[in-house]
């Protein structure tokens, strides 16, 4: 009788352990899915922000170009225009971030991919905002 009791208790413990392992695996896969969805949302928001900035920079660049067509540019103005053109090329390369990130991030895990994406955004957005601010400031000074 004791042997049957020991076998029954062992079987119950083993089945409970198997169920808990199965539940752990399911919760991990659900967590992975949620993390992936949140990364997609973050990328979507970043893409929208970059798209808006790109449109604003293109508008500012066109305005600056039309301003400088009829007038002479100083060396400083020429340098600002060169920087804006370089920024525009960088922004154009961000139109297809999935392809670029696929090439750059083969073999990385999701967290490293998210870190690379935010580093790239910071690297591009910092100079863009500075250049747009200085260009618009110069334009406002000349108009006003």
Swiss-Prot record:
It is found in: Secreted. Residues 1-18 form the signal peptide. GO terms for cellular component: extracellular region. It comes from the Eukaryota. Keywords: Amidation, Amphibian defense peptide, Antibiotic, Antimicrobial, Cleavage on pair of basic residues, Cytolysis, Fungicide, Hemolysis, Secreted, Signal. Belongs to the bombinin family. This is Maximins 11/H11.
């Amino acid at each position: 009788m004791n042997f049957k009791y020991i076998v029954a208790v062992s079987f119950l413990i083993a089945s409970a352990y198997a169920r808990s392992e199965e539940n752990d695996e399911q919760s991990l896969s659900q967590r992975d899915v949620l993390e992936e969805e949140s990364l997609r949302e973050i990328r979507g928001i970043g893409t929208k922000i970059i798209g808006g900035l790109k449109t604003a920079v293109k508008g500012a660049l066109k305005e600056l170009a039309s301003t400088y067509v009829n007038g002479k540019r100083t060396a400083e103005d020429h340098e600002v225009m060169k920087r804006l053109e370089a920024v525009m090329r960088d922004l154009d390369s961000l139109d297809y971030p999935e392809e670029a990130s696929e090439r750059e991030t083969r073999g990385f895990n999701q967290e490293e991919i998210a870190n690379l994406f935010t580093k790239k955004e910071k690297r591009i957005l910092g100079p863009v905002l500075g250049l747009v601010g200085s260009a618009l400031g110069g334009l406002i000074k000349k108009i006003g």
